[in-house]
Design a protein with these regions (language model features):
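Pocket-lining segment of extracytoplasmic ligand-binding domains
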Residues: 104, 176, 181-272
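Conserved C-terminal helix/tail region of periplasmic/extracytoplasmic solute-binding proteins
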Residues: 309-336
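Short, glycine-/small- and polar/acidic-enriched structural segments
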Residues: 26-168, 174-177, 195-201, 225-226
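Secondary-structure end/capping motifs
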Residues: 239-316
Length: 336
């Protein structure tokens, strides 16, 4: 998705900063989060291709150190963000919306931009489990950030449709908190009693290549179509105190996103190299080209997702528009 107006805004701000000179000192180091999976591909491209450094230098910030940190879940990134150890968190929409709600009167966390929309699949290696109704008390579901993750909310929304809003937590006792790679391995090994996992690309596609593994639930079916799975968020304090750095990171994210959409093969090669070469370039390229997978800064169907969280009491504040959840820099995009 082209975002020319956004880039004009970012570049104008960068040029203004250079012309005005160092109006005030900005942070000497910017720290960004990474996680596992191709949903985070824009961040991987930013890291490998040095795009944050590029946009910082274009903005006149030549000496800012760029540090990347990996986290196993969005909730872990939230802890680091609030403690001041992280400037830009990344993860599922669930943890981001929860922090937006909790920090309305202090840190004022908002979304910077969406990262990707992609279906999340609840898959199972148990032949008798074909729907949510087939889970017994002994059947466990591995998922990253269980209890607060995006997969948690997808599952709760599906449960509410099946058994009513009053029972939306019916499946919570089945959740086991494991990062996506470990959750996949646990299900495939069968040694831990975990026979299902609610996960993301590429892990769900790897799982489906194994005999007997099948889809139980698709998040797009729950949401009625494509919706934002991953996003980037930050505190208002960081944005206010470091406006040039903030816009440089957003500009880098936009460049990475447009590069992926224009160069899916090169993006697949970059991802495979960065992750150690275990995945097939052809398979990763196929995922990137999948019409169900969108790399875009514009949020998709995030409002009904957040409003469900308010309906069940997960968050206290109810957003009236998708833009309530994000900083103004992307308000001109066609979000939903």
């Amino acid at each position: 998705m082209k975002t020319k107006r956004l880039m004009k805004f970012v570049m104008a701000a960068a040029c203004g900063a250079i012309m005005a000179g160092a109006v005030h000192a900005e942070t000497a180091e910017v720290t960004l989060a990474r996680q596992f999976g191709i949903g985070y591909l824009p961040l991987t491209v930013m890291n490998v291709n040095g795009l944050v450094q590029k946009h910082l230098k274009q903005s006149g910030l030549n000496d800012t150190k760029v540090t990347w940190s990996r986290f196993g879940s969005g909730s872990a990134a939230n802890d680091a963000l609030l403690s001041g150890k992280l400037d830009f968190a990344a993860g599922g929409t669930g943890p981001a919306i929860i922090l937006w709600d909790k920090t309305r009167n202090n840190a004022k966390v908002h979304g910077v931009a969406a990262l990707s929309s992609m279906p999340n699949l609840l898959v199972s290696a148990a032949p008798e489990i074909k729907s949510l109704k087939d889970f017994t008390d002994k059947d466990k579901i591995a998922m990253a950030g269980a209890g607060s993750s995006v997969q948690t909310v997808y599952l709760q929304m599906a449960v509410a449709k099946e058994w009513g809003m009053d029972n939306y937590k019916k499946m919570n006792p089945h959740m086991v908190n494991l990062p996506h790679p470990e959750g996949l391995n646990a299900m495939l090994s069968g040694a831990t009693g975990i026979r299902s996992t609610f996960t993301t690309p590429p892990f769900q596609y790897i799982a489906l290549e194994k005999p007997g593994v099948h889809v139980v639930l698709n998040s797009y079916d729950v949401m009625g179509g494509a919706n934002t799975f991953l996003m980037v968020w930050a505190t208002d304090k960081f944005r206010t105190e470091n406006p040039t750095t903030f816009k440089a990171v957003l500009g880098a994210l936009n460049e990475a996103t447009e590069w992926i959409n224009a160069n899916p093969r090169k993006a697949a090669e970059l991802y495979v190299k960065d992750t150690g070469g275990k995945d097939s370039v052809e398979e990763i390229e196929k995922m990137i080209r999948d019409p169900q997978i969108h790399y875009t800064l514009a949020p998709e169907r995030i409002l009904p997702y957040a409003q469900f969280m308010n309906d069940v009491g997960t968050i206290k504040n109810r957003p009236q528009a998708w833009s309530d959840l994000f900083f103004p820099e992307i308000h001109d995009l066609k979000g939903s």
